[in-house]
Curated annotation (Swiss-Prot):
The gene is rsmA. This is Ribosomal RNA small subunit methyltransferase A. S-adenosyl-L-methionine binds at I18, G43, E65, D91, N110. The keyword RNA-binding applies. It comes from Ehrlichia chaffeensis (strain ATCC CRL-10679 / Arkansas). HAMAP family: 16SrRNA_methyltr_A (MF_00607).
Length: 263
């Protein structure tokens, strides 16, 4: 199944194709059992991962692809796996996955890097619809998702995702597994949805608090919080949080406590 020479990857779609079924089989294996699940794949490209998923016999697989040039490849796979595989030619950013598939759902994808973070945050709005995500990201983004406090990579993305899920980095991959080769390392991560958020908080309000505080991550938390409240010092004292700490030193729970105290 070598279609690489026939399709010129589009840079504006972040197209980096994986041609090795050994690699895609490995990624799909990280998703665990899929025979009892419906699967979503975003950006299926040449279909290598698509075959790896279908060969593990999911209840159903739906792939969403924006590039019309790849339709012929996937129409053939639809014929080969009749009733099991559905191909949607569309922009994944414009689709609410709840409208096209029934749970339980796992997402397995080599995400287009230019929309990967936006997609993930969008899915967090209805994370209870999903069981898990097994996703390839640019390594720099994956490191931010799994980062813990007191780490330079820890920030808004880490907190918004980890509030709602358990995250695990599975493996790093070099550019050589892709065609064309990107200039960055890549990583596969597993995101396992929690039945409930770790802490009670207004998610959109938390997002705003994080955006404000981490926009000046080297400043002390008392300084950045003054943009959001008139009593930052008193609030931090009441929560027993050292006001000399920087945002990257605070736990998810502490950020939720702060958010809940801001009117």
């Amino acid at each position: 199944m070598n279609h690489i020479s026939k399709i010129n990857p589009k840079k504006e779609l972040s197209q980096c194709f994986i041609s090795s079924t050994h690699i895609t089989d490995q990624i799909v294996n990280y998703a665990g059992n899929i025979s009892d699940y419906s699967i979503i794949e975003i950006g299926p490209g040449l279909g290598t991962m698509t075959y790896s998923i279908l060969n593990k016999n999911p209840k159903k697989l739906i792939s969403i692809e924006k590039d019309r040039r790849l339709s012929t490849i996937h129409e053939k796979i639809v014929e080969e796996f009749q009733g099991k595989y559905e191909f949607i030619l569309s922009d994944a950013l414009n689709i609410d996955l709840r409208d096209i598939i029934e749970p339980p759902v796992k997402v397995i994808a080599n995400l287009p890097y230019h929309i990967a973070t936006t997609l993930l945050i969008k899915w967090m709005d209805y994370i209870n619809f999903f069981t898990s995500f097994t996703l390839m990201f640019q390594k720099e983004v994956a490191d931010r998702i799994v980062a813990q406090p007191n780490n330079k990579n820890y920030g808004t993305l880490s907190i918004l995702i980890q509030l709602l899920s358990n995250v695990y980095k599975m493996e790093d991959f070099g550019p050589e597994i892709f065609s064309p080769q990107p200039k960055v390392m890549s990583s596969v991560i597993n995101i396992i949805a929690l039945p409930e958020p770790r802490f009670h908080v207004n998610y959109r309000k938390l997002s705003q608090v994080l955006k404000t505080t981490f926009s000046e991550r080297r400043k002390m938390i008392r300084s950045t919080l003054k943009k959001l409240t008139n009593n930052a010092d008193e609030m931090l004292e009441s929560l027993n949080i050292d006001n000399n700490l920087r945002p990257e030193n605070l736990s998810i729970e502490q950020f939720c406590q702060i958010t809940n105290c801001i009117n």
